[in-house]
Amino acid sequence: MVADLLCMVGFFATVVLIFSRRAKRFQTNHNRALDALAKHHGFGFNPNHGWNATVMNGTIGKHRCDVSFETVRRRSRRNRSRTYLHVSVSLNGPSQLGLHITPQGFLSEGLQLPDSLTGNQDIIIGEQAFDEKYRIKGFDENAVRAHLTPKRIHAVLQAQASLGPLHRLSLTDQQVSVRFPGLISDMQTISNTAKLLVWLADQFEA
């Protein structure tokens, strides 16, 4: 019986060791790929990001771009965590509207009580596709409506269509950004996303 127990412990220890080595190998290879991407764009690279900080930053066109990781700890007995990748592009002429545009709906917000009960703000712009897809907040509703011209609304919808439904596009007074639902191993996807956000920032500053 003791021998069986030792065999079982040895088996599980071996499995843990294998997965640990694979995870370490993935992290090493992923960091190398990120470093190569940073060098391609002439960005500064932070090798000590620890999966919860800025990884690289620099300039594309006229805009500053940041790529970062965010690790969120889940409240559970297993103490699980999830890591997201963020790509953000700063606006050169930030507005003072208190603008905050984020995806809405069950996939983005989870179960929510009606806004009439929670008092959660959602400015209606008057463009059905845009209003249904995004929650819009700001200090002055009329100023926000004036700021979100048909051209800018179309640019946001076009960018979201290029990204896909699982990539969380959001906008504020200061920046446009995308949150990926996990680590992205395809460096070209990260590069293309940064360029897309630069294009979107240009549409808001045209």
Give the residues covered by each predicted segment.
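Residue-level signal for functionally critical sites in structured catalytic/ligand-binding pockets
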Residues: F26, S68-F69
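Feature marks short, highly hydrophobic, charge-poor N-terminal signal-anchor/signal peptide-like helices
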Residues: M1-V9
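Charged, low-complexity intrinsically disordered regions
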Residues: N31-D66, R73-A206
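Transmembrane-cytosolic junction motif
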Residues: V16-H40
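Hydrophobic core of alpha-helical transmembrane segments in multi-pass integral membrane proteins
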Residues: V9-L17
